[in-house]
């Protein structure tokens, strides 16, 4: 696990927790500081909070591609990308950048992420962020959290940030995503769930292909989140919400009943 920062961080955090239970307080800070070295992870954020470190995230404004010193135009796909930028064909531009993702070198990746950011290509941006990590680059935190151009057909009824968090986790903003269990689109909605939860007549009457429409997918996903938030076993708790969304409210209740938390809070 020496190259796996995420597991190192979670391991360090729980080591600190173990030392706290043992009363070995001199060891706690060492392991919390080690966990905090990965501030983009869940356990890294928890470690920073416990240490009392106010780690400010710089949400840098969009930057423009430097066309006078562009490495990307020197690769075969470069001219096609330049043309697509000029005519503003965002969908085709995204496909082209994703297509060259496997051959990106460091400089091409840096320029590609600028294009993705400027055109709000959230799925592409996350793929390139992963590539930059492979190159060992220190990626600015804000690049891990792109925003989507899509919104629910009937508008946002819940916080926009909440839906973005679920899109990020469920599909990485990939509108064509489909799981082995049949969950579809940005919010990875199961057709059976859509039929159960939706108030939309066209969704009830249509086959699952309607969920490939990102605005309808977000509409149904938002309705399901609203339904779950009001359940007694969720009680507007975000951790329980995420559990119920992925595993179902029935499983959430079962796990709550069966879990011995052993005073862990």
What role is predicted for each listed range?
Residues 63-74:
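TPR-adjacent "capping" and linker segments in tetratricopeptide-repeat scaffold/adaptor proteins
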Residues 76-99:
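Alpha-helical segment of the N-proximal tetratricopeptide repeat
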Residues 9, 13, 74-79:
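Alpha-helical tetratricopeptide repeat
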Residues 40-44, 49-57:
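Long, contiguous interaction/recruitment modules in multidomain scaffold/adaptor proteins
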